[in-house]
Amino acid sequence: MSNSLVISVDAMGGDDAPDMVVDGVKLARKRFPDVRFLLFGDEARIGPLVAGDSALSAVCTIRHTASAVSGDAKPSQAVRSGRQSSLWLSIEAVKKGEAAGVVSAGNTGAFMAMAKLILRTLPGIDRPAIATLLPTLRGESVVLDLGANAECNANNLVEFAIMGEVFARTVLSLDRPTVGIMNIGSESGKGTDTVRDASARLQDSALPIRFMGFVEGDDLGKGTVDVIVTDGFTGNVMLKTAEGTAKLYSQFLRNAFLSSLLARLGYLLSRSALQKVKARTDPRRYNGAMFLGLDGVAVKSHGGTDALGFSNALAVAIDLVRQGFNESIKDEIAKVQVLPSTVSVSHAV
């Protein structure tokens, strides 16, 4: 490949791979004509999809792999038996310097396990975290961790805050993003020892972070802060709840507009506004969760997305590489000294 930016792609990951993946790469090529792609997977299936588009063929190189990681494979099983899989080899391309970042719509647990093993974490980072953007009344907010770490200590949350702040500056183009820790209340005395300890460290440190204290569940939609930090268990439940609520209200609206002739007329009158709302909350627009803290750019696409959604995940990876995201995290982590724990051990709820 030339000196162009190269993105490695697990072409066999996702519900409708490789067709959806290749179609997503086609869309990404139009947005980023100077980017090249390494496609890992079954060449017999990928080749014909690429060959039909001369412009796409010019920017794609196919690397045949004999296997793919299934969606239901356990991470430990995938790591043991999947070292010749499209997922493993696409990540390995980043480690070898053949690509600047990797994108997969495959098994999340396997992707994270392999990425941690192959890429390792950045110096000073204990655990990587999964981060993504979610729509709010004010625009978008970064939320992390979304499932990589079910249990976290205070230092993990501080690291997440640092990485999330850099992520917000990079993807949202914010000069000084605001950061909050998810809690059961906004008062300083509420919550577990872990969240209060993390809050105290961020409040008392010399880190250049606009830490706003604790936020609650309803602050997610309000956009109270630009970055919401939480453990992976809470974050994953929060994300799935938000997705489920969006589907619920969408079905409520559909049922209401189908309930009578007058309601159908009401839909026709309000269709333009409803289409704007739909576009604003379209999950494909926010597809592309970043594995923060790894020594390489790794982006996870939703497995059930379509070509547009996958192209947006590719766009996230490309933007992060071009803006030197990992280098920025290294610089910020290097500023962190041992932050004192100043919170008492009593439980306030």
From Swiss-Prot:
GO terms for cellular component: cytoplasm. The keyword Transferase applies. InterPro entries: FA_synthesis (IPR003664), Phospholipid_synth_PlsX-like (IPR012281). It catalyses: a fatty acyl-[ACP] + phosphate = an acyl phosphate + holo-[ACP]. Its EC number is 2.3.1.274. Pathway: Lipid metabolism; phospholipid metabolism. It is found in: Cytoplasm. Pfam families: FA_synthesis (PF02504). GO terms for biological process: fatty acid biosynthetic process; phospholipid biosynthetic process. It comes from the Bacteria. Keywords: Cytoplasm, Lipid biosynthesis, Lipid metabolism, Phospholipid biosynthesis, Phospholipid metabolism, Transferase. Homodimer. Probably interacts with PlsY. This is Phosphate acyltransferase. It comes from Rhodospirillum rubrum (strain ATCC 11170 / ATH 1.1.1 / DSM 467 / LMG 4362 / NCIMB 8255 / S1).
